[in-house]
Amino acid sequence: MTRAGFPLEISDPERIPTARYYDADFYRRECEELWPHVWQMACRVEQVPEVGDWIEYSNLGKSVIIVRTKDGISAYHNACRHRGVPLTEGSHGNCKGKGFICPFHGWRWNIEGKNTFVYGRHMFSEHQLDEQDLALRPCRTEIEMGCVFINFDDDAPSLREQLGPLAVGLDAYNADKMRAEWCFGTVLPANWKVAMEAFMEGYHVMRTHPQLQQKVPILYNMMYGMDTGGIGVPINPNRSMKENIVDQVDHMQLLSEGMAGMCHAKDVAVARTLIDVELPEDPQQAIMHWFGMVNHCVTQAGQARGEPTPDLNRLAVETPVKSVEFIFPNYFLLPFLSSMAAYRIRPLGPESCMFELWSLTHFPEGQEPPVVMEPVMLPYDSDQFPMIPRQDYSNIPLQQKGLHAEGFDFMRLSKVIEGLISNYQRIIDGYIRHEPMDKLSAATQKLAGNFDGPVLDLGF
């Protein structure tokens, strides 16, 4: 039996129809068939620390209030039950005493979502003011990785189920204990999927981030090919072991400066102290031994400062986490040693999106920085962005323009190292086709560790 398709559905997993990145009808399908049924990262837990603290999350015209109650964290659809006006003014605040007050007619709700006041109550029919019906509509929430996630679908599998084994790895990383140092945001003139796919493979490093490939060509050439077409730097077999170690530290320094949060300066400082350590003569064993020492010393240094740094060597063996982990449909974590960068991408239209990035790390208890409540918004070409995302941002708008080229009907992917792009795109198709939720959840689990990975059989 042949499955009935829909326009722009992927038929060849190595070829992605380009109109999926700008077609208005396909964008409408995503808005209607995908986004109402997926887990969306709404805020960080530290943004609502005290009872009554609230923050608004919005996406595709839907607004949700996340609020700290006496019993935990709740979320409500941000609309007055009278005539639909949003209840919040501003993006965040505290309503412990007054609750949520509609700016239109003054109706009021407490932080548990219960209506506490209706002006001119006697003028309304009794059934209009039924207590249960008048309560704010709750929105489903789960807390993972130090973040509050929301889902508009009460029947969707749990976020924990969707994450699968990745949840265990992130737990071991103590991701829930990390705090944001800063957050930047920008609006990119590109489809949200174009913006995300720039971070789903490392194959672009040689050309887009040449400073990284030039520093440790052995790392990138071994993964993507020795012949760099005269653009990248070839491997130099004559470099001494110490020179190679210095290159690794310098590479970390470039990541620290270029990605800020991904490779933290405190970890680079530890690595620098290990440049002159005694190592095995075999180069491959020496590099592995050196990285093991870096893991150990970063762990020890963090714990000595009172930070909840995990045992990085044990983590690498028992619950490994890739350098880029994609959490469907629009959130990334990029762990490196003790810290992480995080990305969230939200659609603003068929060819526009909001891109936010955070620097996350551990702090000793009581020494956490001030809570970051809003991103610092910058133009996408601002030199205030770290170098590496700035280099990526320079390509993204160009790619969006190129997708409209006459005769360019599909993107052609490597089935070996660009599989993550194909895999998550076909999961979007699964939502549009209304595949069973258990199959979608099982397919989504396969995205864990799929960075630079192959095209997979998703089971539908």
Residue ranges of predicted features:
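Short, contiguous pre-domain boundary segments
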Residues: A4-T18, D176
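Rieske [2Fe-2S] iron-sulfur-binding domain
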Residues: Q47-D154, S158-A172
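C-terminal catalytic domain of Rieske-type non-heme iron oxygenases
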Residues: V67, N78, E142-I143, C147-F460
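Short, basic/low-complexity N-terminal boundary segments at the transition from targeting/disordered tails
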Residues: Y27-A42, K114-F124, V317-P320, F326
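Generic structural signal for secondary-structure transition and capping sites
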Residues: W35-W39, V85, H204
